Amino acid sequence: NKNIDLFSLDVDGIDYWILKELPKNFSKIAIIEFNSTFGSEKEITVPYKENFDRSKYHYSNLCYGASLKAINNIMKKKGFIFIGTNLHRVNAFFVSKKYINKIGLRIPKNKDLKKYVDSNIRESRSKNNLLSYLSGKKKIQIIKDCEIIDLSKKTPKRLKIKDIF
């Protein structure tokens, strides 16, 4: 739709799969949630499930959505340029290539996304559904047996987190 100025996607789960179905240049500006726990180097997402619920997928609430690299790469294919994230580093901002010259922003290098994934949000849960405030590698360790889709190959591959981290 050529009339959409701002599009925001934050469904705590299958954001990547929704983006995949959208047409190119679907808005001028897009804000897309990503999972900072997945880091900056892996191009991964959770598998598609129609009624995805992050707390049911894993009790910790840490295995959901897609990595920033996965979101960035699909947005490039849709005609967008990554311009940064919010302060909590969980929402990525993109501008359509058609409008990027109308704003005076420094465009980040896509090869170095590391500084955009160090989230200061600590929302992990214990098996008793209590906040556990995990950070760093402890977050990956607790979700190591969760299935994800590795999008870095020509044919996406279903793996467990422990297979790629």
Model feature map: region roles:
Residues E41-F165:
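Rossmann-like AdoMet/SAM-dependent catalytic core
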